[in-house]
UniProtKB/Swiss-Prot annotation:
Residue ranges annotated as Cytoplasmic topological domain: 1-8
Lineage summary: Bacteria, Pseudomonadati, Pseudomonadota, Gammaproteobacteria, Methylococcales
Protein name per the record: Cytochrome c-type biogenesis protein CcmE
Ranges facing Periplasmic side: 30-153
Bilayer-crossing regions: 9-29
Gene Ontology terms describing biological process: cytochrome complex assembly
Cellular-component GO terms for this entry: plasma membrane
Gene Ontology molecular-function annotations: heme binding; metal ion binding
Compartment(s) of residence: Cell inner membrane
Annotated family: Belongs to the CcmE/CycJ family.
Domain of life of the organism encoding this protein: Bacteria
Positions of heme binding: H124, Y128
One Pfam family per UniProt: CcmE
NCBIfam families noted in UniProt: PRK13254.1-1, PRK13254.1-3, PRK13254.1-5
Length: 153
């Protein structure tokens, strides 16, 4: 038979173990659902994870949009200046999607180096560009040094 103190210690130990297990599962689920942002230069250099979804952002390269006939499949390239990553997307593109436009795509990179997008988001305000995209474009020479017109007002 256990003394009251031993019973309390057993309950405390079980509660600590239960809370620890719940925290572990919550953090594991949270980690698997995170979508990190990468620039085309980071993807080209191999920094982006293969086999895991992430976000890529940049400008749609002019004359790179190719639509497959009788299909919703679209191929285009997204660039941050010196590097461009081919993107394949099947679905309806946003109304604001066009060449030279800033976009963010969600998906994963395949073995051939093509980004398989599951979602494409176009910027809504013509004067706004996500800070990560603007910094990458500025750093890589794809954006003028004074890019204040791209910042959210």
């Amino acid at each position: 038979m256990m003394t009251p103190r031993q019973r309390r210690m057993t309950w405390v130990a079980l509660m600590v173990a239960g809370v620890s297990l719940a925290a572990f599962f919550a953090l594991t689920a949270f980690q698997k659902n995170l979508l990190y942002f990468y620039t085309p230069s980071q993807v080209a250099s191999g920094e982006a994870p293969k086999g895991y979804p992430f976000r890529i952002g940049g400008l749609v390269v002019k004359d790179s949009v190719k639509r497959e006939p009788d299909s919703l499949t679209v191929r285009f390239e997204v660039s941050d200046g010196p590097n461009a990553v081919p993107v394949l997307y099947t679905g309806i593109l946003p109304d604001l999607f066009r060449e030279g436009q800033g976009i963010i795509a969600v998906g994963q990179i395949d073995d051939g180096g093509t980004f398989q997008a599951t979602e494409v988001l176009a910027k809504h305000d013509e004067n706004y560009m996500p800070p990560e995209v603007a910094e990458s474009l500025k750093k890589n020479g794809g954006l003028p040094a004074d890019y204040s017109e791209y910042r959210k007002k």
